[in-house]
């Protein structure tokens, strides 16, 4: 998949060049690159990728660009020479086709689930705005507080990315497996991805905590909150009434219902 990377910007980001530089090298290749300065990662990906093509029998690669609905938008076969010249063009295309939250900012962003099946970082910072290295990357929504409610089943207890939130739940904490979570952090050196935020007993308390801890909110009585299922599927989202005027003013947003109360169960959870 050719797409924006979660940790750096450059001519080659996530894609074939990075797959040769890191993927084919497996953990050894990943450690070699990640244990050097993050500020030159974009240079290392190209340097390592070119070295692989010069010294290994690479026949070519299949580049896939996805659309905003997590579907295949384009499939293109590339020769080694074309990887060098065409992948940067596909990278530019991916910036146009990927999903975006159609708001610049909110007080609280609620993410139902994170997981490696959604993003290498658990949640895609190009959506959430929570980058591992914000000094090298920007984008996504600007949320004062982020709440993560749960892990996906497919991530098998790997809670990488939990450290990018301020609040989580006991449900997620109980599913977290350190032996699945920590190795990735040791490899990529981004140990703060694995830090554990404040843990609340249920979803209701997690949302309440985040909402009462937003001193920069424009209107403390009408907070701006967005809830998404995960960062890979944001075609249908929930917003608070505080964001309704912004949504109505955007021709690219369709309002699907009248305002309603969040449906917490008897345990205070949303699902």
Label each PLM-derived region with a short phrase.
Residues 112-113, 128-130:
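Hydrophobic alpha-helical signal-anchor/transmembrane segments
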Residues 31-34, 74-77, 123-125, 160-163, ...:
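Surface-exposed beta-strand edges and their flanking turn/coil or helix-capping segments
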Residues 64, 80-81, 124-127, 148:
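Elongated scaffolding segments in large macromolecular assemblies
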Residues 119:
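Hard-cation-handling environments
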Residues 129-271:
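C-terminal non-catalytic interaction/assembly regions of soluble proteins
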């Amino acid at each position: 998949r050719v797409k924006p990377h979660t940790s750096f910007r450059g001519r080659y980001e996530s894609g074939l060049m990075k797959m040769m530089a890191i993927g084919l090298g497996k953990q050894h290749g990943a450690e070699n690159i990640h244990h050097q300065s993050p500020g030159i990662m974009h240079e290392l990906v190209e340097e390592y990728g070119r070295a692989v093509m010069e010294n290994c029998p690479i026949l070519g690669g299949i580049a896939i660009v996805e659309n905003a609905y997590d579907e295949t938008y384009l499939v293109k076969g590339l020769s080694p020479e074309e990887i060098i010249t065409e992948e940067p063009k596909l990278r530019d295309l991916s910036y146009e086709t990927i999903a975006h939250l159609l708001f610049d900012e909110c007080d609280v962003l609620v993410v139902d689930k994170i997981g490696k099946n959604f993003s290498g970082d658990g949640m895609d910072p190009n959506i959430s705005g929570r980058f591992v290295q914000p000094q090298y990357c920007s984008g996504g929504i600007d949320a004062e507080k982020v709440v993560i409610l749960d892990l996906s089943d497919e991530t098998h207890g790997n809670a990488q990315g939990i450290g990018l939130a301020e609040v989580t739940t006991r449900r997620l904490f109980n599913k977290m497996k350190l032996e699945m979570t920590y190795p990735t952090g040791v490899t990529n050196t981004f140990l703060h991805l694995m830090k554990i935020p404040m843990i609340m007993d249920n979803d209701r308390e997690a949302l309440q905590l985040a909402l009462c801890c937003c001193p920069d909110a424009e209107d403390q009585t009408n907070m701006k909150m967005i809830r998404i299922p995960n960062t890979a599927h944001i075609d249908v989202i929930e917003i608070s009434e505080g964001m309704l005027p912004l949504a109505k003013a955007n021709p690219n947003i369709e309002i699907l219902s009248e305002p309603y109360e969040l449906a917490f169960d008897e345990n205070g959870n949303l699902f």
